[in-house]
């Protein structure tokens, strides 16, 4: 299996974010399946979701994510689904968060705050391999972290 580290800005990940029963959950310009079939449908609670947003605005490193690159050039989230959904749903205005002492949704952020969020670089390992290799890697990273 081939695994390469990439830096991808949040702006790229949240592009064309969709979360619907019909179309599933996708982002990255429609090229990223955020909730593939092997992923659970668990969504972070408010505390965990807010910790993701705090991490971004504090400029701290967010845990690495793993994506699978498919033969057709699309991607699937192998690990990092809840973090990705938290970022996308905040950008979509689906919840508010305390930033700089004030409760703010995406629409209430200053241009500087929006730029900081969108320019944040995520560390993403992109994996290519057979379905068996990908499933084995999924099991390993979900046990070993």
Predicted region positions:
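Basic- and aromatic-enriched surface patches that contact anionic nucleotides/nucleic acids
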Residues: 3-16, 36-145
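C-terminal active-site-capping segments
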Residues: 13-25
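Membrane-targeting and insertion segments and their boundary/processing signals
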Residues: 22-27, 107-111
